């Protein structure tokens, strides 16, 4: 692979020249608004710089990012911007880590349009709103760290959703397998989602390992050798991929029927994003891979819901909303998806197999005594769906072999770290001062 080739999210070596200093770093420009905010930023994110020169450079970066933040806020009345964990990075550092590779990606987009199968979508009946988080098809937000691996997170997030919607349990899959093993892409130096799908099909028979068996370790920018451990577990299998029509109506129709879509966009407006809907998103070049998980056209400002890979402490618990209908951030330029054969166990054929049963409802019995016999209340709950609670929280209940997992969340989308509790399927278990029995019912 040519070393000079650029790629989506490519990470260049950025040299920030800082003057040497023997004295330890100390607070500078105390009393100015920017300096006060900078001190708060350092406390919040645990920053400590080795020299006074480096601290001065980081403060200068911080001040410049404050200016950019205010510019974005002035252009986006439906969104809120603020100080994020990226604010001590220079524009060059941030772009090199997260926003590089436009020229290569443009060429790759043209190649995809010519050589990949195009999906068709029924445009006659597009729902007003869809959110695949609420239907259990999206894993928790992840963090690529200081590695240009957004392409892997976008591709893996798409496969996770397609695997679930083909009739399987939602499972978190391995980005590290792609970052370390996929030689059609460039690991932390960038890549493309369609090429990730191609590599899986050509080299692993479409198999992707679980995150538990092959966890992500490249958040510091280091890419270890590809693992061939006998302890790796196959979590999903794809059998193809499609290029989705690059109109937003076609994307909405396909997403509503088929699930989350891997897309590329211009993330130049994302550094200081906190919440709300971006209506004036920069759209100059594709530079970042993300996952489109839903949309809502019922309000004053219609918007897309996008899962990012910058951690749950960025944006709306790791998500961003972007206005629909104007190709904001160039988000309709490169929508793609893997394809999963319905109800196939990893590495098997469905030609003569009965589809695996899928949990539909959980019968939950909560009782006052310890044996699930007295003062009991029975409730039927839809499995694998996000259920909003009062006060802005939500809960989800999931079935897996021999156990049931109940999770509560502080947000309405069942994303991020939840408080989870497991019980055996169909068996009584202690629950607070009484007992509980969860029984999964399948189709």
Curated annotation (Swiss-Prot):
Transmembrane recorded as keyword: no
Enzyme Commission identifier(s) = 3.4.22.-
Listed disulfide bonds for this chain? 147-188, 181-226, 281-329
Q: Which gene encodes it?
A: LMCPB
Highest taxon listed in the record's lineage:
Eukaryota
Answer whether the UniProt record assigns the keyword Protease to this protein: yes
Which family is this sequence assigned to? Belongs to the peptidase C1 family.
Q: Name one GO biological process term.
A: proteolysis
Q: Which residues are glycosylated?
A: 228
Signal sequence region = 1-27
Query: Which UniProt keywords are present, listed alphabetically?
Result: Disulfide bond, Glycoprotein, Hydrolase, Protease, Signal, Thiol protease, Zymogen
Q: Which residues form the propeptide?
A: 28-125
Q: Where is the active site?
A: 150, 288, 308
Among PANTHER family, the record links this protein to: CYSTEINE PROTEASE FAMILY C1-RELATED
Name one matching Pfam family: Peptidase_C1
Query: What is this protein's record name?
Result: Cysteine proteinase B
- Gene Ontology MF terms in the entry: cysteine-type endopeptidase activity
């Amino acid at each position: 692979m040519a070393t000079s080739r650029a790629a989506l999210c490519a990470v260049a070596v950025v040299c920030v020249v800082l003057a040497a200093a023997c004295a330890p770093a100390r607070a500078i420009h105390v009393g100015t608004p920017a300096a006060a905010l900078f001190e708060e930023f350092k406390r919040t994110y645990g920053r400590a710089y080795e020299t006074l020169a480096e601290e001065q450079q980081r403060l200068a970066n911080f001040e410049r990012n404050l200016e950019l933040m205010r510019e974005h806020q002035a252009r986006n009345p439906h969104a809120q911007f603020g100080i994020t964990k990226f604010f001590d990075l220079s524009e060059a550092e941030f772009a090199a880590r997260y926003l590089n590779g436009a020229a290569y990606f443009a060429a790759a987009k043209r190649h995809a349009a010519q050589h990949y199968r195009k999906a068709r979508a029924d445009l006659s009946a597009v729902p007003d709103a869809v959110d695949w988080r609420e239907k259990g098809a999206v894993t928790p937000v992840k963090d690529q760290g200081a590695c240009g691996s957004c392409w892997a997170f976008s591709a893996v997030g798409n496969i996770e959703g397609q695997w679930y919607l083909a009739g399987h349990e939602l499972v978190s899959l391995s980005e590290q397998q792609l970052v370390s093993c996929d030689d059609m892409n460039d690991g932390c130096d960038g890549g493309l989602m369609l090429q990730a799908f191609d590599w899986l099909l050509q080299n692993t028979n479409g198999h992707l390992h679980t995150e538990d068996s092959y966890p992500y370790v490249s958040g510091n920018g280091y890419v270890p050798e590809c693992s061939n451990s006998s302890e790796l577990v196959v979590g999903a299998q794809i059998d193809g991929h499609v290029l989705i029509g690059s109109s937003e109506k076609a994307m909405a129709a396909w997403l509503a029927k088929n699930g989350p879509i891997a897309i590329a966009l211009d993330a130049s407006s994302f550094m200081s994003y906190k919440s709300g809907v971006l209506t004036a998103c920069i759209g100059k070049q594709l530079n970042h891979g993300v996952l489109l998980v839903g949309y809502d056209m019922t309000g004053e400002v219609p918007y897309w819901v996008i899962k990012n890979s910058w951690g749950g402490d960025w944006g709306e618990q790791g998500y961003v909303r972007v206005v629909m209908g104007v190709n904001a951030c160039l988000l309709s330029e490169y929508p793609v998806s893997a394809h999963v054969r319905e109800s196939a166990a990893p590495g098997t054929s469905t030609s003569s197999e009965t589809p695996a049963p899928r949990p539909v409802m959980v019968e939950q019995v909560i009782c006052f005594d310890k044996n699930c016999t007295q003062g009991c209340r029975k409730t039927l709950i839809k499995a694998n769906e996000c259920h909003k609670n009062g006060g802005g929280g939500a809960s989800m209940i999931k079935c897996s072999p021999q156990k049931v997992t109940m999770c509560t969340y502080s947000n309405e989308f069942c994303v991020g770290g939840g408080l989870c509790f497991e019980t055996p399927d169909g068996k009584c278990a202690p629950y607070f001062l009484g007992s509980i029995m969860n029984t999964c019912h399948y189709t």
